[in-house]
Amino acid sequence: MEAAPPGPPWPLLLLLLLLLALCGCPAPAAASPLLLFANRRDVRLVDAGGVKLESTIVVSGLEDAAAVDFQFSKGAVYWTDVSEEAIKQTYLNQTGAAVQNVVISGLVSPDGLACDWVGKKLYWTDSETNRIEVANLNGTSRKVLFWQDLDQPRAIALDPAHGYMYWTDWGETPRIERAGMDGSTRKIIVDSDIYWPNGLTIDLEEQKLYWADAKLSFIHRANLDGSFRQKVVEGSLTHPFALTLSGDTLYWTDWQTRSIHACNKRTGGKRKEILSALYSPMDIQVLSQERQPFFHTRCEEDNGGCSHLCLLSPSEPFYTCACPTGVQLQDNGRTCKAGAEEVLLLARRTDLRRISLDTPDFTDIVLQVDDIRHAIAIDYDPLEGYVYWTDDEVRAIRRAYLDGSGAQTLVNTEINDPDGIAVDWVARNLYWTDTGTDRIEVTRLNGTSRKILVSEDLDEPRAIALHPVMGLMYWTDWGENPKIECANLDGQERRVLVNASLGWPNGLALDLQEGKLYWGDAKTDKIEVINVDGTKRRTLLEDKLPHIFGFTLLGDFIYWTDWQRRSIERVHKVKASRDVIIDQLPDLMGLKAVNVAKVVGTNPCADRNGGCSHLCFFTPHATRCGCPIGLELLSDMKTCIVPEAFLVFTSRAAIHRISLETNNNDVAIPLTGVKEASALDFDVSNNHIYWTDVSLKTISRAFMNGSSVEHVVEFGLDYPEGMAVDWMGKNLYWADTGTNRIEVARLDGQFRQVLVWRDLDNPRSLALDPTKGYIYWTEWGGKPRIVRAFMDGTNCMTLVDKVGRANDLTIDYADQRLYWTDLDTNMIESSNMLGQERVVIADDLPHPFGLTQYSDYIYWTDWNLHSIERADKTSGRNRTLIQGHLDFVMDILVFHSSRQDGLNDCMHNNGQCGQLCLAIPGGHRCGCASHYTLDPSSRNCSPPTTFLLFSQKSAISRMIPDDQHSPDLILPLHGLRNVKAIDYDPLDKFIYWVDGRQNIKRAKDDGTQPFVLTSLSQGQNPDRQPHDLSIDIYSRTLFWTCEATNTINVHRLSGEAMGVVLRGDRDKPRAIVVNAERGYLYFTNMQDRAAKIERAALDGTEREVLFTTGLIRPVALVVDNTLGKLFWVDADLKRIESCDLSGANRLTLEDANIVQPLGLTILGKHLYWIDRQQQMIERVEKTTGDKRTRIQGRVAHLTGIHAVEEVSLEEFSAHPCARDNGGCSHICIAKGDGTPRCSCPVHLVLLQNLLTCGEPPTCSPDQFACATGEIDCIPGAWRCDGFPECDDQSDEEGCPVCSAAQFPCARGQCVDLRLRCDGEADCQDRSDEADCDAICLPNQFRCASGQCVLIKQQCDSFPDCIDGSDELMCEITKPPSDDSPAHSSAIGPVIGIILSLFVMGGVYFVCQRVVCQRYAGANGPFPHEYVSGTPHVPLNFIAPGGSQHGPFTGIACGKSMMSSVSLMGGRGGVPLYDRNHVTGASSSSSSSTKATLYPPILNPPPSPATDPSLYNMDMFYSSNIPATARPYRPYIIRGMAPPTTPCSTDVCDSDYSASRWKASKYYLDLNSDSDPYPPPPTPHSQYLSAEDSCPPSPATERSYFHLFPPPPSPCTDSS
């Protein structure tokens, strides 16, 4: 029998077809176009017919590339970057071509870009500025073409052959417009059936216009005039963005699919996906010569004869000459003027701008000046072309040219808040006002020759304007008594013009031609005008002026900025007609309108500076020369010189300097903060001046030019009437008539020491002789005298005792004589240095007061004559008047180096002293700050270890109650307000206190290292009200009682709150003291019915009441461990008692003559207390109550007292809690056996190790507790499942690794994979038998009972399923006969099929390995953002029928894929859920194509009934757990409140918005809106009254950056 012929080779053909299908080998095709597209982070090229998922990066590392175009002939690629607000370019045909900036200023949101390849121009749209602009390809000659009637212009396309440009506008009135490329013949061509026209492109061959509408989901086309509109694609688009075409194919990008698609340009057929899984596809172009055909234009030859721009036009002669923005075209129609002539200069907070007033577009151009922080005022010099401005944040005055070059800082010292600025363009001077220093000052225009013109009676000076022709200046003051003032340009002849009906007169402008003065008031909301002499006041405008700030005048118009409207407007000064120049520009400050080419007016200062060497001032009377600070005018009245010596004197709130030679040089030193200056001295080596202020009770210093004012002593002064500088030892001495002390400190106020405090009676004037080592002073007490002592305060000796009230003691160092004025005899006397040889120098004086000596003269002041005079120092003859008309000159001196000459030991290395070097006759002695101890060997000083601290209302003082030290010294602690309680840490040497603002603070005793432990301003519990505090020095903790919450709290000394240790419903703990040595705290409990004294362990346990009777109001407690006693004082019973620490042996210690006791403490053998009413600190012996002594009297407003004793390091180390807090995490308590016991605050529990405190258990037994983070508990099944659910990923830590042949149990156990779903629990948690009704492995059969058995066990005649279902429905057939020819003939094809299947499997495996490797990430085969969409399926199992959609279509790689959750602008690209998957939605409610693009979400968003945060049956467990049935692995989205709309008021000064990169999450609550991708609201507002609406946010999110709009303004949201 003939063998059967071989069958057809169809297995091999099938194999070939499968290989082609699997590996995607393309068939030969014609050349396909290259697509150039922006992908936000980069710009790419892709071959439209090439291999899928392959693209070439043209340029990477971009911020936010949006629009893109090219110039094919040059290989140039252009794109816009909306984050960098720039247009940039690079080249395709150059290796390593650099990115170049084309336009980098004046852009906000450049959405559209088009290249005119013929005319070599760039056109672009800006949807924020609402402009369409054009420039050369290199960005030069930039011009605004359209600025009106634009709302949200986006895409732009050019047709150079016909001279037309087209653009889309998706604002309030969506439309497509056409205009000539020169800006002519503008016309709307499409305005119906249009909503969000995104993409736009032109078919140059068929002369068709294509556009895409993202809202209406279609692509249409029409003729270029808008006629014959046709549908191309409709209804099946998700979110098309940009379009382009090539041949018969139309290409577009889609935001939602993140892909590039294509179809037939006429029918919409042949739809296909070109490239997918893009980051964020934006604009797209076909990169080919056909898209940019070349032809000749008239602009090719000599630029069309144009000086700047030659723009193509649709009308004869088919081109137009144009000028850069703001520049006018001359009458010849070809040449542009040199530049803008009338310009508006604008200061914004962080930039300067210029606006041309020559052209109607009013485009603002940013000056390229760096480091502008907070520009306020601005002005211009038309001669040199400099722009001047003030910066309030950097505290400087700067200037630069109009193009931004030549930036300089002119003034940056002694300037606080420079609000106004004005240029005297004639005299070349610069004036400014400063609301911080309350001055008006002037310099030359280059910043030299600075001089203060006005410094008195200024409150809040702001605007300033100059009239150089009349020699006048005008300024506004918006302080408590607002006014407008006028003075000569030199500051003289000051007068008030307007002081009625003013609020905040911010702006000021002069009309030089008309002689008018205009101002704008931000409080009365008016613009008013008067004549320059103050007459004929009238209102020009008072409608809709919410907050005027900047103000200027040019020609017939007044211009102003408005803070609230965010606009620049102008009004005609005669007609009062009004225009808006710029709308919705935030951060507007000052402005100046100028004619840059026109100089108006002159005066004599224009001619060689009026002959002045420095400053020239033209005044209504004459030209006056002025000198800068530190120089004097010579008798020629023109030349300024540096004087050899000069007089300095104090006069109440000012310190002046005058010439020794002439009487016309009285100059106030520009010092700030002087109230009532008294004593005066100087340090010539450092050019410092020192003065005392008896009103402020301070000693201050500054440089002689008035700069760097600082307080050197500001605590513990009462009436510092005398003061002298030790210029050799660099020390400062002063006498205080209030405290009856003479003190010394370093010149900076450090190391303060009380020198003399005994036997003083109103010390007054001081004089020093450092060369000899003596100090001299006068006393005005009951027995006035003149005294001498060593400069260390020792060896006091009365020199003159028969004298009246001697004042202003002065030493003639050359002749060794003392001089003084006697206020009782009205004489000036002199003696030798021992008080002998007394001589009367002058005795016919009405009322001499201040006195100084220099050279051969003495100088004195006379209160009755209001003068300063001089006379011969020996005879009193040759009296000369130096200065008259002076009131209450307190002190006077001559500033000259001869007054501070000589040598002593302290001049060299401070005499080797650690702190103070004090000169004495024949040598020196080292000294220390009060209470410090000198080490004689090292000459260093040691701080006190045993002392008392007591607090007053606004001071804390230190006291050492012995005879060797000065008793008390106020510590330099700043900001003390109503101190209530104090304590001290002897280890770190910090003082702790409670103040009246509910703060607990600390600082070193020298005021350094201040720190706030707890404060309401830190956002802590607003109910906190600390009452008392006590420190545990061993555990480094602070215990404090709270009046508001009635608790005892504990803080670490580092500032960390530990929690509450004691609380009760009826408890009111107040006074507290910690006895850490024995592990107890004692406190008073001021319960409603009866006061108590209680004791408890440091953790609040072991609580016991010691006393409930014999108490009314115990206010202070103190423990003495030496005696084992507890002491307390009762303010109402007015007695001090004691008892044993256990409460036994109660004893009254003192109850006589106690009026208002507050504090109590123990130091050594004595018990100290304070009595607020008697203003005393007293003490008794602590054991007997005997020897009651008053320690300090006349101490007002006492509030607390605390004793500090030296801590024994041996005893400290022996404490069980001293080392590492006894090993405890929180509270360490010393036990009686010397071992520590750890405990916790009430909100925590002690864990099993008995050392650490932790949260109480809140998770159920079948849950896993996260270590930290906002999620507390997760289901136990999620532990070690490969996906971190805890914020800190602690659920995936410490997990065992199971092999591929093992099944990982939920709790980490590994079992044989074959035991999965075998009907028996092999995992300890039974997780191997969970979900068996839904899942079996690919080689398993699912039984009806849910059990899984091997497929080969099915129908094997042996029941393997529990219910025997594996043996049901089996057909029992007889094995075929071996000799059957029919069956024999089928063996070959069967073998071929089997071989084919094996080969296909191998190819599939290879393809999977190759393709999947493309997406391998650091964390596994896929990046982190792609997560499994089927959480119940094993990780190596592909769900049946589970088609793989999304960005990796057709690629499974062993996992079912789903796009990650996106946060709008995040990396995922899709919203959390869409409208078609909202809770309760019917499955048939929508036929959106989203269902085919992404796998369905398994569960809807949580509802109130299912969300465990709203309903939880496990009521005793934490509700902070995610839902057990999860639609996807949770990417926890933190709650974020919507940003506030910066609706400003009249005092609003903050217009900043959140960064566009950081404000994406708050849109999530809008995801379920019926319009899932609405555009952001337009920022442009109509001309509305501020009373009706708030101005919109100054910066909205990019329209394509976030797909959702910001929440509505709270002012306009009707909901």
UniProtKB/Swiss-Prot annotation:
Mutagenesis / variant outcome for changing Q1156H: Found in a patient affected by polycystic kidney disease; uncertain significance; the patient also carried a PKD1 variant; results in significantly reduced WNT3A-induced signaling pathway
Chain span(s) of sequence motif PPPSP motif A: 1500-1506
Posttranslational mods: Phosphorylation of cytoplasmic PPPSP motifs regulates the signal transduction of the Wnt signaling pathway through acting as a docking site for AXIN1.
Compartments, record wording: Membrane; Endoplasmic reticulum
Keyword flag Repeat: yes
Effect on the protein upon substituting A1537T: In OSTEOP; uncertain significance; does not result in a significant alteration of Wnt signal transduction
Domain of life: Eukaryota
UniProt effect for mutating T173M: In EVR4; an individual with abnormal retinal vasculature and retinal folds
Effect of A422T: In EVR4; the mutation results in significantly reduced Norrin signal transduction
Positions glycosylated per UniProt: N93, N138, N446, N499, N705, N878
Region of interest called Beta-propeller 4, as start-end residue ranges on this chain: 945-1212
Outcome, altering R142Q: In OPPG; uncertain significance
Chain positions of LDL-receptor class B repeats: 75-119, 120-162, 163-206, 207-247, 248-290, 385-427, 428-470, 471-514, 515-557, 558-600, 687-729, 730-772, 773-815, 816-855, 856-898, 989-1035, 1036-1078, 1079-1123, 1124-1164, 1165-1207
GO molecular function, one term: Wnt receptor activity
Effect of A29T: In OSTEOP; uncertain significance
Residue span of region Beta-propeller 3: 644-903
Any GO CC annotation of this UniProt entry: receptor complex
Cysteines paired by S-S bonds: C299-C310, C306-C321, C323-C336, C605-C616, C612-C625, C627-C640, C906-C917, C913-C926, C928-C941, C1217-C1228, C1224-C1238, C1240-C1253, C1259-C1273, C1266-C1286, C1280-C1295, C1298-C1310, C1305-C1323, C1317-C1332, C1336-C1348, C1343-C1361, C1355-C1370
Effect of L540P: In EVR4; the mutation results in significantly reduced Norrin signal transduction
UniProt motif (PPPSP motif E) ranges: 1605-1612
Tissue-wise expression: Widely expressed, with the highest level of expression in the liver and in aorta.
Membrane protein topology class: Single-pass type I membrane protein
LDL-receptor class A domain: residues covered: 1258-1296, 1297-1333, 1335-1371
Function as written in the Swiss-Prot or TrEMBL entry: Acts as a coreceptor with members of the frizzled family of seven-transmembrane spanning receptors to transduce signal by Wnt proteins. Activates the canonical Wnt signaling pathway that controls cell fate determination and self-renewal during embryonic development and adult tissue regeneration. In particular, may play an important role in the development of the posterior patterning of the epiblast during gastrulation. During bone development, regulates osteoblast proliferation and differentiation thus determining bone mass.
Record: disease: Vitreoretinopathy, exudative 1: A disorder of the retinal vasculature characterized by an abrupt cessation of growth of peripheral capillaries, leading to an avascular peripheral retina. This may lead to compensatory retinal neovascularization, which is thought to be induced by hypoxia from the initial avascular insult. New vessels are prone to leakage and rupture causing exudates and bleeding, followed by scarring, retinal detachment and blindness. Clinical features can be highly variable, even within the same family.
UniProt-recorded name of the protein: Low-density lipoprotein receptor-related protein 5
